[in-house]
Structure formats: structure tokens, C-alpha cells
């Protein structure tokens, strides 16, 4: 469908929605027309929520997860095991692990993977912050819960080499196929993957 059929404002909404992951041309058109024609109140609610979140959400100064405070609830909790640090790629991975309810340590969210072709290196992943956390905390084990993709393998190797302290480093394994994304695993598979993790160092 030619975008000239739509007014400039509708076209702007469609093009904005197309920037979202997995949203193509047809999906963005359907969403835009539904919100503007069938449910303008929902459109206003979504817009206000997004604006408020965009202005107030930031990254936790420790784990780099999204939060409204300087320190997120997990990093600030006295009930979490600070001796175990789980390194993950995204907030979606954190959500998956937390919903499974088996891990009681703390996290570091990379918000990506090392990928030179995409211009993503150690600096973009805030590995300098991770290094300071490792230096300053009494950590006994670092769990690399990173998807087994080419970029994930590169990232896991870099981090394991970066950690100079005498700390146990393990990698989740069972049930995670090569190229698989952690966020898509069911809870039982995720639990098995953690329980069957292998030592790297």
C-alpha cells in the first residue's frame, strides 16, 4: 500500500512503529489504524506512558538494568547473594531468570554482545563498570548466561579472559542450542541450563 494514501501524521505513526523489532510494514499499518481509528484513548495512554518512561527511566549504576532509581531493587536488596554474579545480555534475560525464581544472586546486564561488524565493542557493553564490580565485591562465582551465538561466544571469551581474580567462572549449557536466545527458553529448560552449567575457569 502506498504511503500517499495516508495523511502525513498517520504516515509518521506508521513509520515510527516500523522502527520496533519484528514490526514490518503491514503490522505497523494495522497497529496505527487500530490505535487511531478504533482506540484513540489507548493511543493517548500508550503515548503518555512512553513519554513518562523515556523521561524517567535510566540504567542502574551497578547492573545496568532499567530502573527509575540510581540503584535498582535487585542491586539494593540485602536478601540477594552478592557472592554470585550472573552476566546476561538483556533485560529480557533478567526477566526470564527472575520469573523462573531459582537464582538469588545479582546481575550485570550487557545490553548487547561484542560485534565488531555492528560497531559494538567492550566499551559499548560497559565492561569497565563490570570490571570495577568484580574488583570491589567479594564474588565467588560468575555465571555467564550468554546466548551461544557467534557474538555470544566472543563476548563470553572476552569476559572470561578479562577476569583476572581467582573467581570461579561457569557457563550455562544444557538445553540451549547454538544460536538460541536465552529469553525464548521455557522456565524448566532455563533451570536445567543453570544447574548443568560448566566451569570455564
From Swiss-Prot:
Toprim domain mapped to chain residues: 83-177
Keyword Zinc: yes
Disulfide bonds: none
Segments forming C4-type zinc fingers: 60-75
Keyword Metal-binding in record: yes
One GO-annotated biological process of the protein: DNA recombination
CDD domains listed in its UniProt record: TOPRIM_recR
Function: May play a role in DNA repair. It seems to be involved in an RecBC-independent recombinational process of DNA repair. It may act with RecF and RecO.
Name this polypeptide is given: Recombination protein RecR
Source organism per UniProt: Francisella philomiragia subsp. philomiragia (strain ATCC 25017 / CCUG 19701 / FSC 153 / O#319-036)
Amino acid at each position: 500500500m502506498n504511503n500517499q494514501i495516508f495523511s502525513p501524521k498517520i504516515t509518521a505513526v506508521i513509520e515510527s512503529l516500523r522502527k520496533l523489532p519484528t514490526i514490518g510494514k503491514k503490522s505497523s499499518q494495522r497497529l496505527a489504524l487500530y490505535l487511531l481509528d478504533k482506540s484513540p484513548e489507548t493511543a493517548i495512554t500508550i503515548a503518555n506512558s512512553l513519554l513518562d518512561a523515556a523521561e524517567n527511566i535510566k540504567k542502574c549504576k551497578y547492573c545496568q538494568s532499567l530502573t527509575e532509581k540510581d540503584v535498582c531493587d535487585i542491586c539494593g536488596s540485602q536478601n540477594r547473594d552478592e557472592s554470585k554474579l550472573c552476566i546476561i545480555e538483556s533485560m529480557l534475560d533478567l526477566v526470564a531468570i527472575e520469573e523462573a525464581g531459582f537464582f538469588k544472586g545479582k546481575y550485570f546486564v550487557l545490553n548487547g554482545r561484542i560485534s565488531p561488524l555492528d560497531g559494538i565493542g567492550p566499551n559499548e557493553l560497559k565492561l569497565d563498570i563490570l570490571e570495577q564490580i568484580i574488583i570491589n565485591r567479594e564474588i565467588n562465582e560468575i555465571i555467564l548466561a550468554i546466548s551461544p551465538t557467534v557474538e555470544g561466544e566472543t563476548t563470553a571469551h572476552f569476559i572470561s579472559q578479562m577476569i583476572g581474580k581467582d573467581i570461579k567462572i561457569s557457563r550455562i549449557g544444557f538445553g540451549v542450542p547454538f544460536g538460541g536466545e536465552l529469553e525464548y527458553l521455557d522456565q524448566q529448560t532455563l533451570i536445567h541450563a543453570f544447574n548443568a552449567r560448566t566451569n570455564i575457569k
